[in-house]
Each structure stands twice: as structure tokens, then as C-alpha cells.
């Protein structure tokens, strides 16, 4: 017997969060570890979970046969059964639609908050209520732009030359991955036009949303960052000299192929240089099974590493918790964000909060908070020579590194930790609800 949440939360504004991965208590329910992505959702929940006058319902899909529900922190956690993986989820499937319809009937939300347009479960949740419940989408990444820039810096000949059996078998070669993003961008357009309300951080993101859904209402809120990063402070004297930390990779958007080309130039001048790469990786696979599982992109990156003999200069850290990430950043000399497209880059913001001197490709919405020569340095994504020069500049100039790192830390801590997610989100929810009442 499923509980009627009306008996628990009748006096509160009820907001249903639709997330593309389990967060908070949902991870415990499904016995899953912390993910390295989506930390802003965890931080937002931590801030909102005890807010007065609002009750959250956190829902995502899982591989199961029945709806699971539990209550924690006074909020509802709902695991929605699915017979499909999140990547192959069909938003038009009658079973999927019926399960989301049950969730809406059970929790009876006043408003639906969709976290990201990346996966089809978001569209399914919106279709399940047929436009009757006001909805808002928090933009995590603009899929149309990710598709446009997916293979930047990798020529078609290299995409073919380094194609692997596993990618051929799975129809997952780089140009096929790019086409999948374009397909997902079509779904993104449906999501934005149905919800008609979006939360963005940058003008770049707002412009992209309006190009897709011209009449959508845009609300601004800065990306919430885990406060654990403010507990660590970069110090020039204590950092590992000539070491670089970067964002987790695994696919071309993150720009590791360009970073490797720049790093090769750095190593010529500083043979002791180290590049630390977080996240799970099959890059240096040695056993037969792991080598057979290597992706085209991993194989392409490894070809650059091997060509320049960088194997001993690269350290794969594996998956890191937020605190481990903060600690590792604080021990490196320089941070580089090399992506070909980013909406806001939480990783870059986290690094700035720690106080490490940073370098970023000039992409997406980064320029909203990142100022060249003041709190960091920009370079064009397809100019690894410039990136290498900027890294070397930091290595050579202690005063510059300390100045840029200190400025970035001061500005980002003031900006991010002055944010009241409670006030921002609740104000947005109330504005959307009031508009909905007026129009209906």
C-alpha cells in the first residue's frame, strides 16, 4: 500500500525534483555510491531539505518492478521502476508514462523541477501530466551546443583511424556519438517548450534557451557549490611544483586531446611535470579484456601520450569524493579546464574556490564569472600552444600564480557562498506558481 503524501505534507508547497541519477537518500535506498557528477544537486538539496513551507519529492528511475518510497529529512524519495536503462529510456512508452503518472498522483506536486535535459526521463515526467502542472528546467548543459562542438579538434581521419571494435559493435563511434547528441537536442527542445520555464546561470545559456523556446520564462540562479571546497586553501609553498589538475574526461567535449598536446610542450621544458586526471579511466589498460573495452576516444588520447612519451607524467587518480577532489586540487600547482563546450563548469568554480591558479578555454557561459588576467587566464580551445605557454607562465611566476589564485578564491567564495539557494529557488517556484494561477 503506497502512502498518501497528502496526509504528511498538506500544508507545504510540494516540489517534485526529477533527477537523472539518485541523490541524497535515494542512493541509500538503492545501495549506490556517491557519483562524481551532479554535485550541485546534492548541494542544493542539503540547503533546501529543512526549509520551512516547502517539501521536496526526489524522483528518478531505477532497474526494478515497483515504485519505492521512503521519507527522510521530512521529504519524499521515490524510485520509479524502469525496464530500460537511462540511456535507452523511451518517453513515449506507455509503461513509463504510467509510472510517472502514478508518481504525480502519489506526491501531488504543486510544481515540477527538472534537473537537466540530458535524458528522456525528464520528457516522460513532463508528458505524464499533460501540461497541467507548472514546471521548470534547471539547465545543466545545452545539448544543441554540445552536439555542435562534440568532435572539435579531432579530424574525421583520426576518428576512423582510432576506431575500436567495441565502439563499432555498439554503433558508438565518435561521429555517431555526435549524432546522438543532436537527437537528444531535439528532445531538449520538446522539454523546454513544454516546461516553458528555465533556470540558468549565464546570459549565454539564456540566449540558447530563447533560440530553442522563444517564449520561455528565464530565471537566474548561480550554481550551488559544495562548501567542502572552501575548507581547503591552495598554498604555493606547499603545492607539488609543476603539477596540473584537470577535469574528469572520458569523452571529447572535455578536451583532453587538446590538453595532451599542450602538456607535451610543457614536459619538454619541465620533464618532472605531472598531470592529474580524476575519474574512472581505461586509458592505460594493459590486460586483454580492458584493452578490448577501450573506446575510440581513449585510444586516440593514448596515441598522443605515446607519441610524446608522456606515460610517466600522467597520474590517473580514479574516482574521488568531493573532499578528496578538494584536497587533490589544493596540492597541485595549476588547474586547467580544457573543454570545447561548457555551460558553467562546476569543476573550474571548485578549483577557484580552493584558490589554485586556473586556466580555462574560452567557451560557453564561463566568461560570466571568469575574467581574463584578473581571476584566471583564457585561451582558445583549439590553440594548445597558448595553453602550454600559460601553464609555463604560472610555473615561472610565483607572484602571478599567487595573485590570480587569491583573486579567484576571494571572488568565487564571495559569490557562491553568498547565494541562498533556499531564497533563489523558493522565489522562482512562487513566481512560476503565481503566473500559472493567473493564466489558468
State where each predicted segment sits.
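Aromatic "clamp/platform" in nucleotide-sugar-dependent glycosyltransferases that forms part
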Residues: 340
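Short hydrophobic beta-strand element within catalytic cores of glycosyltransferases
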Residues: 357-360
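Membrane-proximal helix-turn-helix segments that form the acceptor-binding/catalytic region
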Residues: 43, 159-197
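Conserved acidic donor-binding segment of nucleotide-sugar-dependent glycosyltransferases
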Residues: 372-373, 377-384, 393-398
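Nucleotide-activated donor-binding/catalytic signature segment of Leloir-type glycosyltransferases, i.e.
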Residues: 289-319
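Conserved donor-binding/catalytic core segment of Leloir-type glycosyltransferases
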Residues: 16, 235-254, 260-267, 275-278
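A charged, aromatic-enriched C-terminal amphipathic alpha-helix characteristic of glycosyltransferases
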Residues: 399-436
Amino acid at each position: 500500500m503506497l502512502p498518501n503524501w497528502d496526509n504528511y505534507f498538506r500544508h507545504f508547497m510540494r516540489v517534485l525534483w526529477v533527477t537523472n541519477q539518485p541523490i541524497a537518500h535515494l542512493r541509500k535506498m538503492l545501495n549506490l555510491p556517491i557519483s562524481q557528477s551532479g554535485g550541485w544537486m546534492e548541494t542544493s538539496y542539503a540547503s533546501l531539505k529543512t526549509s520551512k513551507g516547502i517539501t521536496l519529492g526526489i524522483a528518478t528511475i531505477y532497474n526494478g518492478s515497483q515504485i519505492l518510497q521512503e521519507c527522510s529529512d521530512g521529504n519524499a524519495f521515490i524510485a520509479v521502476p524502469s525496464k530500460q536503462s537511462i540511456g535507452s529510456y523511451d518517453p513515449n512508452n506507455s509503461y513509463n508514462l504510467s509510472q510517472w503518472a502514478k508518481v504525480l498522483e502519489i506526491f501531488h506536486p504543486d510544481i515540477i523541477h527538472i534537473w537537466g535535459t540530458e535524458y528522456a526521463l525528464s520528457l516522460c515526467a513532463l508528458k505524464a501530466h499533460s501540461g497541467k502542472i507548472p514546471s521548470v528546467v534547471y539547465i545543466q548543459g545545452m545539448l544543441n551546443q554540445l552536439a555542435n562542438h562534440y568532435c572539435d579538434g579531432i579530424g574525421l581521419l583520426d576518428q576512423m583511424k582510432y576506431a575500436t571494435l567495441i565502439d563499432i559493435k555498439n554503433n558508438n563511434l565518435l561521429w555517431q556519438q555526435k549524432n546522438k547528441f543532436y537527437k537528444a537536442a531535439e528532445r531538449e527542445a520538446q522539454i523546454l517548450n513544454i516546461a516553458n520555464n528555465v533556470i540558468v546561470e549565464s546570459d549565454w545559456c539564456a540566449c540558447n534557451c530563447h533560440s530553442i523556446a522563444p517564449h520561455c520564462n528565464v530565471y537566474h540562479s548561480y550554481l550551488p557549490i559544495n562548501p567542502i571546497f572552501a575548507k581547503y586553501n591552495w598554498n604555493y609553498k606547499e603545492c607539488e611544483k609543476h603539477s596540473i589538475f584537470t577535469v574528469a574526461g572520458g569523452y571529447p567535449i572535455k578536451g583532453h586531446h587538446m590538453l595532451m598536446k599542450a602538456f607535451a610542450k610543457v614536459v619538454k621544458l619541465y620533464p618532472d611535470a605531472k598531470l592529474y586526471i580524476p575519474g574512472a579511466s581505461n586509458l592505460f589498460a594493459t590486460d586483454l579484456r580492458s584493452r578490448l573495452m577501450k573506446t575510440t576516444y581513449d585510444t586516440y588520447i593514448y596515441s598522443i601520450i605515446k607519441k610524446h612519451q608522456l606515460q610517466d607524467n600522467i597520474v590517473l587518480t580514479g574516482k574521488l569524493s568531493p573532499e578528496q577532489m578538494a584536497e587533490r586540487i589544493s596540492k597541485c600547482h595549476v588547474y586547467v579546464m580544457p573543454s570545447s563546450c561548457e555551460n558553467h563548469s562546476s569543476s573550474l568554480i571548485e578549483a577557484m574556490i580552493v584558490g589554485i591558479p586556473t586556466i580555462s578555454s574560452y567557451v560557453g557561459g564561463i566568461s560570466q564569472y571568469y575574467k581574463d588576467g584578473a581571476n584566471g587566464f583564457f585561451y582558445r580551445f583549439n590553440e594548445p600552444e597558448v595553453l602550454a605557454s600559460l601553464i609555463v607562465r604560472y610555473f615561472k611566476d610565483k607572484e602571478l600564480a599567487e595573485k590570480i589564485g587569491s583573486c579567484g578564491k576571494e571572488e568565487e567564495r564571495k559569490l557562491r557562498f553568498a547565494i541562498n539557494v533556499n531564497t533563489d529557488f523558493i522565489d522562482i517556484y512562487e513566481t512560476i506558481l503565481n503566473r500559472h494561477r493567473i493564466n489558468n
